Amino acid sequence: MLTTIEVFSDFVCPFCYLAEQPLADAADGGDVQIAWRPFELRPDPTPTLRPEGDYLQSTWQQVVYPMAERLGVPIVLPRVSPQPYSRLAFEGFAYAEERALGQRYTERIFRAFFVKQRDIGKVEILTDVAGELGLDADDFRAALESGRYAEAHQQALRRARELEITVVPTVLVDGRRLEGVPSAEALHRLFDGAVAIG
């Protein structure tokens, strides 16, 4: 029986990026499907963070870099300042998801921001990523510029609020949740419980 893991995340959250590997490891070889779901930590007009600020500098030095090293995941604190809003990237996700490319789009957007330090709040950067995936770049750009997926994104955010998601990443399996970067062991326990219940 297929188990669906819902992962609520924000493209500008390093912990969401770091959760990718444990999730992939836990899903590997199992009857598991990962479904990424949007959550904006700082929706417009809330000010976004600046990488040169004390908060991000200390968080990355004390927590993010050590965790990334333990997980073997390359990551850098992007120099993009201020950090971008993620709304457009999530509207692009809705476009990709409709074409069965949501997982690959998510992976590419995380890497664009946390490895290549690209400004994922810009339509042209998102369009480049879409083109790399083989999506119709002109149609993708037009979709973002026209707001074609704005309502789909807002519906996804409403669902997150209904589920009382307040922390990312949050992993849901059959109504049970894990918050923060999950270990592979915790994920396996979560899956095993879901299979036993199902």
Question: Which positions does each model-derived feature cover?
Answer:
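C-terminal cap of thioredoxin/glutaredoxin-like
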Residues: L2-T3, F15-V32, W36, Y55, ...
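Hydrophobic "anchor" residues on beta-strands that sit immediately upstream
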Residues: E6
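Short pre-active-site segment immediately N-terminal to redox-active cysteine/selenocysteine motifs
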Residues: S9-V12
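Structural alpha/beta surface segment adjacent to cysteine/selenocysteine redox centers
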Residues: Y17-K116
